[in-house]
């Protein structure tokens, strides 16, 4: 009898050892879960239980955010069909993303349509209707956003505050705003980030194609920008973080825009801009300035009196070619006393327009 008991206990022990622990079963189920949502509220509340998320023909209610900021590490998010948003005057954002090792992508033929003309009044964020920001890519780490097709954002499209984020083959088409009052429709606004890599972007808008306000190790390559204010660093100053370091903007085109490439720092503020490269940028149809680097910026209009609290150093401008309009200025440099230094300036070939006689404090080797 005693021996039978021992055998029974041994068999029971082997069964217990062979069975997976409840936590492991639970982990396996969660890792493999795939969810398709057609309701915005359900997506926002339940996304954290899924490892693969499909957002199909989502209609986000007015005044609400499609909140995908609590997803699990490693989640894949796919937009399918048409994503739309109800109308309300508010600050937004309409979409919020966050997390680690997140992949955001889009099915063929899908679109995220902000229907921005409902808010457009020619004033952007400077008055008139309160307009929601479109997409916050904040607190993303080691993540990828690729292939998004975004249309008609009320104001700024993608706000980035992230570490090691890749944004690939993204289209932002606000061209309807040219005739319907679009304003401040920036493509990518980057701040407080380390490692942002944008490639293959196609942006049509009425403001900066990209605006880097702070951060380091930022790259923009293979982009096409049309209708806006060009490839910008700044405006720098007046924020919690006013340092830009390690920027490469290369192999891109800017057409039918106010400016080509631009660095602007706010007058009488402090900060720094360093280790910046603009290389192989082709310009055409530039209405105001092909290359503009100014230290007198102020919203509402430059002062004409540059300050030197935000030095701009270690800048390479190489291979900026193309043309500007007949009334435009090919190159305009306005630096504070001693605050622009160690620049490399070569292969700048811009035709058209009129040279400026108002350039000031140019670094060695640079000409207007």
UniProtKB/Swiss-Prot annotation:
PANTHER family: ENDOPOLYGALACTURONASE B, POLYGALACTURONASE. PROSITE patterns: POLYGALACTURONASE. Belongs to the glycosyl hydrolase 28 family. It holds the Pfam family Glyco_hydro_28. Gene3D superfamilies: Single-stranded right-handed beta-helix, Pectin lyase-like. SUPFAM superfamilies: Pectin lyase-like (SSF51126). This is Probable endopolygalacturonase I. One of its GO terms (cellular component) is extracellular region. The keyword Cell wall biogenesis/degradation applies. Keywords: Cell wall biogenesis/degradation, Disulfide bond, Glycosidase, Hydrolase, Repeat, Secreted, Signal, Zymogen.
């Amino acid at each position: 009898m005693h021996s039978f008991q021992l055998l029974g206990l041994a068999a029971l022990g082997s069964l217990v050892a062979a069975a997976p622990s409840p936590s492991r079963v639970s982990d396996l189920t969660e890792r493999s879960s795939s969810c398709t949502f057609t309701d915005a509220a359900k997506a926002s509340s339940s996304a954290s239980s899924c490892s693969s998320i499909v957002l199909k023909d989502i209609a986000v209610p007015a005044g609400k955010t499609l909140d995908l900021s609590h997803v699990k590490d490693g989640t894949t998010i796919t937009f399918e069909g048409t994503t739309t948003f109800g109308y309300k005057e508010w600050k937004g954002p309409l979409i919020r993303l966050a997390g680690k090792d997140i992949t955001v992508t889009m099915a063929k033929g899908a679109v995220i349509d902000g229907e921005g003309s409902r808010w457009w009044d020619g004033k952007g964020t400077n008055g008139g209707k309160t307009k929601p920001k479109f997409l916050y890519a904040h607190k993303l780490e080691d993540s990828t956003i690729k292939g998004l097709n975004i249309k008609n954002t009320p104001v700024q499209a993608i706000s980035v505050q992230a570490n090691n984020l890749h944004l690939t083959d993204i289209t932002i088409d606000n061209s309807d705003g040219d005739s319907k009052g679009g304003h401040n429709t920036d493509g990518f606004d980057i701040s407080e980030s380390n490692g942002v890599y944008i490639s293959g972007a196609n942006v049509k808008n009425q403001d900066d194609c990209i605006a880097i306000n702070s951060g380091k190790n930022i790259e923009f390559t293979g982009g096409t920008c049309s209708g806006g204010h060009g490839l910008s660093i700044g405006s720098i100053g007046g924020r919690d973080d006013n340092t830009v370091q390690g920027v490469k903007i290369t192999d891109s085109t800017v057409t039918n825009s106010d400016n080509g490439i631009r660095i602007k720092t706010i007058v009488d503020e402090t900060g720094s801009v360093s280790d910046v490269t603009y290389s192989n940028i082709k310009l055409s149809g530039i209405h105001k300035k092909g290359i503009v680097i100014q230290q007198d910026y102020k919203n509402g209009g430059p002062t004409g009196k540059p300050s030197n609290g935000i030095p701009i150093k270690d800048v390479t401008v190489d291979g900026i070619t193309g043309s500007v309009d007949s009334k435009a200025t090919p190159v305009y440099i306005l630096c504070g006393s001693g605050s622009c230094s160690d620049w490399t300036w070569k292969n700048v070939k811009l035709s058209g327009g009129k040279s400026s006689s108002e350039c000031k404090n140019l670094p060695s080797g640079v000409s207007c």
